[in-house]
Amino acid sequence: MKLIENIFAIALVAFIAYMGIDFNAKEDVPVKPKTPTFSQFMTCEIGENWSNRFVMVDEWNDMKVSGMSGSLGHRVYAGDDGANDGTVSWQLFWDSKQKADAFWNNGPTDEFKAWADRHRSVLVCDGEGIRNYDVDLPRPENKQGEWNGDGEFVSVVYQCNFTTTAEDGTVSPMEDKEEGKRQMRALYGEFMDYVDQEDKNASWHIWSKTGKRGPYNFGVYTHNGENPDPFMDYDFYWMNYYETDEEAKARLARWVETGADLQAKFDEFSTCEETLIYTGSSVLFPDLDD
């Protein structure tokens, strides 16, 4: 995806900051966020004035972006060659692809330009490397648990392909990717039932210090069109969201212990890399404009 260079200089430099944002700062948002169906990722390099990121994000919070459901910043710290390499993966959530296209096609507003000009040295984003995904976020908000509100959390990324397994155990790529998506979505309900039951039973787990588990959510990302290499090496990315690293490891260990039957059902249509990618992630909600 290639846009006019000066638009990237103004706009893409602008999606900034790997940091914690206070959710309570946006209590007066007049429009309830919609569940996003489309998401974009950009790989960005930390600039020389990274220390100014808090000022930049504070100003970002005062702008309106039509159709944007929210933003995340991810910085890999384990499980990938790019860990701690001075880059941030910036993620945008949109109500729809149409809203995202309208934003990019219309170009930045004067307010947006002025803001970007003030802060362009904080982060530099590779506009030509933008990646487009359809996103499923099936778990209801009222089932996720209580996030602590500081905007910081842990993402654990599975890199996966849709596959078939022959009777002799040979694993092959699935030709019909849409069938793979159908089978995956058909398991969301059973997976969420498993998570709910685990949360219900958490009070007697020896590792549970509070008598309950921390919050949990997940998102599944499939390509919308062609994305740059090497991202097309995988058919989908499954991302688990936890409040802390400790919580992530405890839940993953519990999955190994109790989730074998459900894992076998996922294995019928998919294969994921054994190495998981851990990222420290942060939330940023812009003003919402219907």
PLM region spans:
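N-terminal Sec-pathway targeting helices
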Residues: M1-L12
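Short S/T/G/P-rich N-terminal loop/turn motif that feeds into the first structured element of a domain
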Residues: I16-D290
